[in-house]
Curated annotation (Swiss-Prot):
The gene is XXII. Heterodimer of P20 and P22; further multimerizes as hexamers of heterodimers. Part of the dodecameric portal complex that is composed of the packaging efficiency factor P6, the DNA packaging ATPase P9, and the internal heterododecamer P20/P22 which spans the virion inner membrane. This is Packaging protein P22. It is a single-pass membrane protein. Together with P22, forms the internal part of the portal complex embeded in the virion internal membrane and which plays critical roles in genome packaging and genome ejection. Both proteins multimerize as a single ring-shaped heterdodecamer arranged around a central channel and interact with the P6/P9 external part of the portal. GO terms for cellular component: membrane; viral inner membrane; virion membrane. Its main location: virion.
Length: 47
């Protein structure tokens, strides 16, 4: 649960150039996961 709350915290903060590497990795990871999930949903709907 801690990871989810951290991600929510990072996503609610305005983006800064000095954002920590962990924040960026979590943000990028979140986007990748969202894209994969979206593709799975689309595929499920089409079938």
């Amino acid at each position: 649960m801690q990871l989810i709350t951290d991600m929510a915290e990072w996503s609610s903060k305005p983006f800064r150039p000095d954002m920590s590497l962990t924040g960026w990795l979590a943000f990028v990871g979140l986007i990748i996961v969202a894209i994969i999930l979206w593709q799975q949903i689309i595929r499920f709907i089409i079938e």
